[in-house]
Amino acid sequence: MSRKARDPIVLPQGVEVSIQNDEISVKGPKGSLTQVLAKEVEIAVKGNEVFVSPAAHIIDRPGRMQGLYWALIANMVKGVHLGFEKRLEMIGVGFRASVQGSFLDLSIGVSHPTKMPIPTGLEVSVEKNTLISIKGINKQLVGEFAACVRAKRPPEPYKGKGIRYENEYVRRKAGKAAKTGKK
């Protein structure tokens, strides 16, 4: 059983949670999110707190889904209240990014420009041509799109060129040593 899931999720002011059938929906100032619930968990809303507990009819490992749904609901609450943001930085000569309509256009040292469609529900902005900011209310969608952008040109260990998360540490390797010895 998850230790964190024993505590209730406290709802900030302006956030509402409703449960209908097997679906939970969270509404807040930034938008609304829904999640289908598994039969292994029971959700109870009391005042401004949400409680996640294992279902009574589950005999085999009753708390295995409790922590998962606690985290999913907590992320939904945080997303509709504050939102999520991932920032990526591009390091390399000639590396640039720009937003054109619903596409993120990347110039990352290949012969053709790379265009990535921006998923609905995300807001992408580019600062100083090399700093990409991805914002949204769905933590999974923000992280997944940021990972897809990073995967187009991950940082390489010798010169550090590529796309990396802001403040990400890239372990550097020493280059090949010069050949010494007999001529």
From Swiss-Prot:
- Asked whether the keyword RNA-binding is assigned, the reply is yes
Which of UniProt's keywords are assigned here? Ribonucleoprotein, Ribosomal protein, RNA-binding, rRNA-binding
Question: Keyword RNA-binding on this protein?
Answer: yes
Q: What's the superkingdom here? A: Bacteria
Q: Which InterPro entries match?
A: Ribosomal_uL6-like (IPR000702), Ribosomal_uL6-like_a/b-dom_sf (IPR036789), Ribosomal_uL6_a/b-dom (IPR020040), Ribosomal_uL6_bac-type (IPR019906), Ribosomal_uL6_CS (IPR002358)
- List each coiled-coil range: none
What are this entry's molecular-function GO terms?
Answer: rRNA binding; structural constituent of ribosome
Gene Ontology cellular component terms for the protein in this record? cytosolic large ribosomal subunit
* A single BP term in Gene Ontology: cytoplasmic translation
Q: Which HAMAP family match?
A: Ribosomal_uL6_B
Q: What is the annotated role of this protein in its UniProt record?
A: This protein binds to the 23S rRNA, and is important in its secondary structure. It is located near the subunit interface in the base of the L7/L12 stalk, and near the tRNA binding site of the peptidyltransferase center.
Summarize subunit and interaction data from the UniProt record for this chain.
Part of the 50S ribosomal subunit.
What does the similarity note say? Belongs to the universal ribosomal protein uL6 family.
Name this polypeptide is given: Large ribosomal subunit protein uL6
Gene name, Swiss-Prot/TrEMBL? rplF
